[in-house]
Structure formats: C-alpha cells, structure tokens
Regions:
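C-terminal hydrophobic helical "lid"/dimerization subdomain
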Residues: 1-4, 245, 296-358
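Glycine-rich beta-strand-centered segment in the early N-terminal region that forms part
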Residues: 27-42, 54-112
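Residue-level marker of beta-strand positions
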Residues: 33, 40, 106-107, 117, ...
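C-terminal substrate-binding/catalytic core of Rossmann-like NAD(P)-dependent dehydrogenases/reductases
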Residues: 217-221, 225, 267-320, 331
Length: 358
C-alpha cells in the first residue's frame, strides 16, 4: 500500500487578502481511516471568498454551538486558517487497520479541504465513491449540487410551478437545472450575459438581467400573471433578495440560500414582503427542510445529484472555467475577489493523473 509522503501541502488563508499553498505534515493513519491523495478541489466563490476578504462571521465572532448564536468574543477561527474547501476528489492510496468498504485505487469525492492528501473515515467515504462513468473533474460538483438541490426542495417545487432563480453562478445554474428536472417553469436572473445563456441551455424558459425597467418583480408578473409561485435567491445580494420578494405572488415563497454579508439596506421589509404576506425560508446545507422529515438528509442529496450526473441529465462541464495548479491559489482568489465575469467554477489541481480517468 502506498503511504503519504514526508511533506504534504494545504491551502492557507494567512490573513485577509492573503492565501497561499503551504507545507504541512501528513496526518497519521489510524484505525478505521484511509489516506486519500487529492486530484481536484473545487473553489467556492462564496463561502471561501468571505474567508479571503475577512468578512466571514466565523473569523469575526464566536459561534456558540449550544445556543447556535454568533456572540462577541474570540472568533471561532483565527488567521492563519488552513484546510477550508468542501469539494474534493481523490484516490484512496492507503487503508488503515479496520478500514472497510474501500480499496486502494478507489476514486472518491468528499470534504477534506484544499490539501494534497488527507486521512478520512472509511465509513464516510465508502458511500461517496465516484459513480462509474462520471468524469473525476465533475466530482467537485457533488457538494454544490447538494446545496442547489436543498434549495429546490425548500422551494417545494411542484410540476408546472413558476419559479424565479436569482443568481446564475455555479450553484444557481445547478438549481435552475434541478428545478427544470423537477417540472418547474424557470426564469433565471443574472447580470452577466454568458451566465444567462448557460441558464437557457440548462432549460430556463426566460432569462432576465438584474435591473430591467420596473424591476424583476414586474417582469415576473408579465411572465406568469400575479407573480411566481416561488423564488430562490442564490447570489447573496440583498437587492436581489428584495427583488425575489417582489417577484412572487401573494403568500408566495422565497428561499434565501445565498451567504449574505454586512447590512441589508436594500431589503425593504415594509413593502411587498409585508403587504403580500411573503414567506421567506432559509436554506443551508447543514439541514434539509423539516417538512421532509427523516426521508431526506445530506447523504440522499448527494446520492440524487450523483444519479443525475450518471444519467447525463446534468452536464456540469461548461461550468468549469479554470483548472489551475494548487500553488497558483493566490492568483485564483485575487481574480475571484475582483469579480471576473467570465469565471465560474475554479478547480485546483493537486495530483490528478494525466488526462483524468473516465
């Protein structure tokens, strides 16, 4: 069995505005664990960018796990912060004692952070083998696909519903596609033309810029009369959240699934939210909608998304705009921070085999 090297590498946010690939010691392989060598790691342009900018609440406040409140005090994470990242794909290279369900050579996906290798629980990864026929590069989409599917479930989409999806980044585009597969008529909203084009390719019946005359709310009423059944907001922009509220019908549902930062001056809750009795539902990958009970959990989200990849009903290839060596991570985050309009899914390449594996 292959063993970890004497030196590993991990992406570290050294301070706000500074991110780099640094050396670290390989983790010790213990019973029930496996060592995974990373091939690819997808970069989040939302959560991880908040760590780069220093705006993530975990680096400014303390998360009280018992009260589930952010409170004043020592931040939960202090710079330098290493090991963030939640969209990894790699190969099992070593089995620890008592590890079962996996073999050396298995290709798996999961969460172990932007690092060259990791030691992960075998029982966790045994259910996360890359499905046959799925390009390993596309394995970076499992987590974001689960986030998108969770938002669609929160919207309670029914066959024939009219749904507006705000924000056509990676998660927004996947949500658009999943909503179409669920039987919804979808309108996609984004300020970048290329993203609107991708949304149309994913099945959106209408695509709108973010600031049409009269606002998106007026367009939604022209599109379906009386407003949409539901809207999903995935940009993390308060103005977009306000327009999502304006776009739905009386007593319609808005799913707030973006990672919102700072104050909410653009959110006017005394207007359509109040007078149309709009319901706002938060969607976050830490849990699935309560009304679904125990039937849906994180594992099922991953499994269902993987089934769509295997069937080819979701084709995420066009969403990958950048594949870069991990040691170029500083340039990657500078580009994301600048808001490059052509960038969607950036993938860090660690030790992927030549040509990948089909």
């Amino acid at each position: 069995m292959e063993r970890g090297g004497t030196v590993a590498t991990v992406v570290q946010f050294s301070s706000p505005g500074t991110v780099e690939l640094v050396e670290c010691s390989p983790a010790t392989l213990t019973p029930g664990m496996v060592r995974v060598r990373t091939w690819y790691s997808g970069v989040s342009a939302g959560t991880e960018l908040t760590a780069y900018r220093g705006s993530n609440p975990y680096v400014t406040k303390h998360w009280d796990t018992e009260q589930r409140l952010f409170v004043d005090g020592a931040p939960s994470f202090a710079y330098p912060v290493a090991g963030w990242g939640y969209s990894e794909v790699g190969e099992v290279v070593e089995l620890g004692p008592e590890a079962s369900g996996l073999q050396v050579g298995d290709v798996v996906y999961g969460i172990w952070g932007h690092r060259s290798e990791a030691v992960v629980a075998a029982d966790r990864l045994a259910a996360q083998k890359l499905p046959a026929g799925v390009d390993p590069l596309h394995g970076v989409f499992f987590r974001v696909g689960a986030i998108a599917l969770n938002a669609v479930l929160a919207a309670d989409v029914q066959l024939g519903d009219r749904l507006v999806v705000f924000g056509q980044g990676v998660i927004g585009l996947l949500a658009t596609r999943l909503a179409v597969l669920s039987g919804a008529h979808v309108a996609a909203v984004d300020g970048i033309r290329r993203r609107r084009e991708l949304a149309a390719g994913f099945g959106a019946e209408a695509t709108w810029d973010v600031a049409p005359e009269g606002g998106v709310g007026a367009l939604a009423r022209q599109w379906c009369g009386g407003g949409a059944d539901a809207a999903i907001e995935l940009s993390g922009n308060y103005r977009a959240l306000h327009e999502a509220i304006r776009s739905v019908a009386t007593e319609g549902t808005v799913v707030a699934s973006g990672f919102y930062q700072g104050g909410a001056d653009a959110l006017r809750l005394g207007e359509e939210f109040h007078h149309n009795r709009v319901r706002i539902v938060a969607s976050q990958i830490g849990g699935t909608p309560v009304r679904l009970g125990d039937r849906w959990n994180h594992a099922r989200l991953l499994r269902v998304f993987g089934e769509q990849l295997s069937r080819g009903t979701i084709q995420p290839g066009p969403l990958v705009t950048d594949i870069v060596d991990a040691d170029q991570v500083g340039a990657v985050f500078a580009k994301l921070d600048a808001g490059d309009p052509d960038t969607l899914q950036v993938v860090l390449r660690f030790d992927a085999p030549e040509g990948g594996r089909q």
